[in-house]
Each structure stands twice: as structure tokens, then as C-alpha cells.
A protein has these predicted regions:
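N-terminal redox-cofactor-binding region of secreted/periplasmic oxidoreductases
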Residues: 1-100
Length: 100
């Protein structure tokens, strides 16, 4: 049983989990969609000072997310007229800060 469940181990989720656990009575579950990273086993791509290695590694980001960047007009006949663009989101402990 947990007192708090935090979905997303990005910058905000990780900081929130840390602050909540400053009270040892709180039981906190931090969920992240990325690969499991045991303590002391952070992948070299994440630790590297050049973020491109982590950014290009498909384990650390969603590869198929797309989003419309245009407003749908009431005059449009079908949704295929709205172009979709790649939507880059990290899936690693630390979120986008780990791969940018």
C-alpha cells in the first residue's frame, strides 16, 4: 500500500517523490515507462555529457507519438487533412532532462 503514486519520473515527478520521501512515514511509488535502472546501473548514454547518444537511443523515448499542430476548422471534411508531426517525449528516469 502506498500513500502516494506518482506517474512519470521526469524532472517534476522525481523531485516530488524525493520531497515526499523526506518524511520517512510516507510510502511513495514512482512509475516511469522507461527501462528499469537499478541503483548504480545508469546507462552510459544517459551519463555521457553529449546528450545525442541518449536522444538517439530508442529505449529512452517514445518513437511513434504524433500530434496535430494546426487547429481543425469547422469547414474540414475529414481528419486526414490535419497533418501530424512527431511529438518527442522521453521515457526514462529524469524525463527530457536526461536526453536533451
Amino acid at each position: 500500500m502506498f500513500d502516494y503514486i506518482i506517474v512519470g519520473g521526469g524532472s517534476a515527478g522525481s523531485v516530488l517523490a524525493n520531497r515526499l520521501t523526506s518524511n520517512s512515514k510516507n510510502k511513495v511509488l514512482l512509475c516511469e515507462a522507461g527501462p528499469d535502472t537499478p541503483p548504480g546501473k545508469v546507462p552510459e548514454q544517459i551519463l555521457d555529457t553529449y546528450p545525442g547518444y541518449a536522444y538517439l537511443d530508442k529505449r529512452f523515448h517514445w518513437t511513434e507519438l504524433k500530434v496535430s499542430t494546426e487547429v481543425k476548422s469547422h469547414n474540414m471534411k475529414d481528419e486526414d487533412q490535419i497533418p501530424l508531426r512527431k511529438y518527442e517525449q522521453a521515457r526514462v528516469l529524469g524525463g527530457g532532462s536526461s536526453i536533451n
